[in-house]
Amino acid sequence: MLLPSDVARLVLGYLQQEKLSSTCRSFILESPNLREYAEHYTDEGSIPGCVLSLFGKNLTTILNEYIAMKAKENKEEIPVMVSALWKKLDHTLSQIRSMQNCLVLPTSQKVRTRYGIQDLRHQRMLTSHAASTGSAVALQQTSTPIAAKQVMLRSFTSQSASQTIVSPLCSGQSTIQCTNSPATESKGETLQNSALSDAEKKQTSSPMRRKTDCQRRRRAAPLNSSSATHEGETEGNVDSLQDLIDGNFPQLVIENAREKILSNKSLQEKLAENINKFLGSDTATQASKLSEGGALEQYTSIDEILGLQGGEMHMSEEAIHDILEQTELDPDFQELYDLFACSSTKPTKLASRDPSLQTEGVATTSIHVANDNLEPMESSFDASVDTSHSSNHSEVGAAQKKDGRSQLVVPSPTPKVTESTGMPSKVQEMPISASERQSMSDRSVESKKSIDSVIILDNTGSDTVIESNEEVQVTSMEVGISQSQDVDMNVLHTEVIGADCQLAVEQGSLNMLTVDLTVPNLKEETPKMQTYEKASEAKKSSPLKDEVQALGSRRLERNKSEGAEGPCTTESQNIVVLVSIGSTVTESNLLNQRGDLPATPRKTDTSTETTVSEQMQAESSITSKELKVLQKQASKTPPHPMVPPISPSIKGSSSDSDGSSLPLEVSSSVGVSTPVNTSNVEQNCSDVSSVDPSQIITLSFITEDIAEDAELTKAVKSISERSNSALLLSPFHKPQESSSIVSIPGPTSETLTLLADPREVVNVSGDVATGVKPAEDCTIISLPGASNLSTDGGIIQLMPATSSSFAPSGSFFISTCNTGGAQQSNIMVVPSNCAPASTQKQPCHFQTPPRPHSVYTVGQAISPKLSQGSTFILASAVQPVLPGVMGMFPVSVVGQSSNTFTTPSHQVLHVPVSQGVPKLSLPPKSQKPVPPRTLASAAEKQGTAATTDSGNRKSSSRMQRSENVDKNLAAMSQNKPEERQTSTTNPSTKGTENHKRVLCFENTAANRGTPNTKSLCNSAAPQNKDKVETMNTSSSSLPAKQNNKDSGKADKTAPSTEANSKCESVPSKQPVVPATKDLSGDKKPVAVASSPDVLGGVMANKENMLQKENKKQELPEVSKKSSTADGAAGNLERTVQAVHETGRKHATLPSILRRTKLSTERMCPPSPLTKQASDLLQSMQFNSPNAKHFSGGDLPIPRTPGSGIDDRLVDSHQDHMKTPKSKRYPEDGGTPKPMLPPATPELPACSPASETGSENSVNMAAHTLMILSRATLAKTDGSSPLKDNTQQIKLSKNSSKKRKLDEPDEYGRRPHKKELMSPSAILKRKKMKKHRKKSTDDFPAGMDVDKFLMSLHYDE
């Protein structure tokens, strides 16, 4: 609602803007709506606080906007017409330019096609590069005779006749030109035939293929949308090119399509939906566009025709293409597309289109296509061949797709065609492509019935497009050879369908990639085609050699019709190869697309790929030679072709020249045979044939985005280019097996196993399982560390397109053999899970190939210095621990202080699952990694045995870690890595890991770090927990008491403990007193533990039943004191125990626990609880002075900020733990409480769970770590500090006795847990911390705050 005052203010604002001050003044005075302003306006007429605008717009702006709106309403529509005319002019000029490319513009489509084919052939002979790029286009142009007109549509891209305008999109198109080109070759014509016009291809292709074609077209020069119409016209219409130029489309087709759309409301709605999706334009115009677009062929012309007719030229080409794409995908529009196909093309076109479009009707369509194609082929062999080939190809692809084999079945239809054609096997293979396709379409109807489903799948997927690309290239490249190749390929393909479901699926995924790649891969297409031809030859030679010789063309035919079933193993293997070859181009495209290694796919992915890039240049010029050579090679290495089938990407493998490259088995994990040695290839072939489908792991990298990932592509390229290693899914572990599969043994051994799921261990071959023992919760990526590997394996992680930047669980790791291994790093830390350690359910094993260097330096801000192109350390799911490390090397591995860490040359990284403490769990317990600081230090001190325990303690006691980290960390971490490695490697370690010590109260056994602790010794566990609590509550007292108690407990527990205590000189001496303490402490700690108040989380002992409140209180005090003593000592003790236990072996650990349990139980049972409590109290009193002195007197004790306060805390804590007496409760109630809460809150902070939370938790954790570290420092200062501590303890015992006695009572009264957990407790703790900071005793002399902070940081 606009009020008059608003208008007045707007006007006033305008007057002020125009600086009409006098008018402003008079206006303000006279306007009834501005009376409130009259008193406030200044001489200039401005009002200080007044906003003279409406919704932020002043009068001028509002008026201008209004004018603009009005002007728009009155605007005439001339611009639309003008733009349409300009577009038409532009289109016409582009067509003229494309026609100029043709030497002659024959009036007859057939003549034009012939010229185009000849021109293409000529061009290919002349320039390899031009041939690769241009001929691909030309190939596409070459279409079935019907498609000849379509060529005109491709005016932009055609290098040969304007018809060959088909751009890289052609490759994407469903018609597989390659097969056609073979037919063309048989005729002596070039691949040009294979290049079908967009319309034709679309007709022959399934909606999916058409979609991919559209995308490709978009990428390429705008395709003529009229191509479809031209196809329709091809029957009797004028040249499609001329039609395009004249703008004469088959009016009947367009009208029919329009009528259909208009008569079907659902179609209209869907069209409108699709159009509105991309831009809200008139439905009618869009519908008309779609009707024409229905024949996706009218790309460039869509705008002209539709724009001129409908006057809707304002839609961008992109939008129209998008809409068309959307429409293509809609089955409801199938009829429309069929309309265009039928009316515009002869039955051949319709048939070909139907198979591609209608997956189910592939067989029938194939037959129709075959018949129809035969006619056009006869009339114009080149065009007809191409057309039939493309249509058949699409059919085949469709059939394949039906099977769900998204393999490139295109080749198989060709063989079928060969069969019907009855041409010689070799001739049948390629030359028959056109006729073969036709006969094949008939044949394919029969044999396709088995393969039809497979073919249909291809059509549905992008596979068809891939096929067409491959074929297009192949045809031009393999003139003579391609014939036989195609036949074999078809046969093989048929076989493959029957035998290699996985392969087919892989191919399908590859095909998907190929679709995207087709446009960009046009350049690669020719090489790929060449590769394809080579592969075909190899297949041809091997299957033809064996089969043709044995079965002859009849067998080839039978394979086509029945061979799909896999008439013979060799054949089926070869078929696989052929199929893979068929998809080889596709695969290489896929790889390129995928960004696996655009270059690598050629070299590494498949020999074909290598052949592609190498052959692209050499082959284009020497296509015939190379084809022949390839054939020879193929004959030499018949098994080799089989290998390619296993891995479509290996298609190139058929050419031995690529022998050096180990084809990546991307699509099929069956075996990749590198054509290094012909004999090897043959062996591989046999191996492949023997390979069990179950062993085939299908790694389908269908990441369309990967191709666009420049970095990944680069990395893959660099790795693969160095030396191609095969990705062997099944025999990655067994070098021999992989060598059998892969001709190159070295790369094979180094072959990285791709794990489709990082968590899954690929047991493709039984050897694999033996090679790497998957941890219970581990994923193993094993790079067979064969000594024969001269270079390190580079690991590439292919990540499926996901939102997460870190490696997803489904990511694939590709390992390649890199030369210059001397610089490569040995470390491959690849956590299988992206989830943080806490969620990490499965540890991972990573085995790295042996590497020359074992020492790695970690730069401050730089990632570890790895030789470039060596190992890709993929970021683990866990965020990088060290900023400079890129998350590859956890701090635990690298260590806090040192920039370098050593790793064994060949090692298995065991990434344990940290069940207890998420944060503590080190990403991977890599053998190299330095053990967690505290664990490392303690465990290292203890000995290798500690490693096992360290795993347990790791999670259980971060606090210990922080304590030990400072001094122990540096020395121990260095030593420990080895220990840890051993522990990690050992299965026992796993068990230990499962039983990690957690500071959490819930885990009784966690502290002990022994799996049995929880169940075996409740008493021991309570003590441990008490220790932990004590550590948290009174860190200051902990060090001294811990040492005492640890030594005592260690002595009690076992000689091993004694040895540990001996390691700690002080503890060994102290043990005598602590022993008594421990006896009493243990007795009552058990009770304490059982008492819910004290331990809460700890459950369970016989003592629990016996607990009385007094006893409970006493026990808590005693236990807490003992735990404090044990707490600090607990760390040492744990370390000692861990070391000791490890030394004793896992078997020993349980016994130690039992001993502890027994000792505690013995202690408890001998005397009544009350008696125990009194004893404990007495012992506590004796010890408490020590503890007090220790805490107060010993600087090392972190928690003694104020000797008085700390002592109280320590005393109260200890008393509380040991035996708070009801008498003392009232006395100590006041002071101890405040002290304890601070200490207690620290406990939660220490626990990983609490730390995970907020900044508060981090701060708390930091404080606890600091305190613990101080305690550790006190302990670790050396034996002397410990001794001093003992002395101090004695001194402090006397002084602290009273305080402790008082405090224990208070503590006993008040539930420690509540206080610890309560916010007030936290506040108290903070206050206590402040007090501690104030006190000089607080920081031990030797303490390095930074170090502790750093360690703290790491833990967090």
Swiss-Prot record:
Record keyword Transcription present: yes
Biased composition (Pro residues): 638-647
Region (Disordered): 180-242, 379-446, 589-688, 916-1092, 1107-1130, 1180-1258, 1276-1342
Location(s) in or outside the cell: Nucleus
A GO molecular function held by the record: transcription coregulator activity
Domain LisH: 3-35
Family: Belongs to the NPAT family.
Protein name in the entry: Protein NPAT
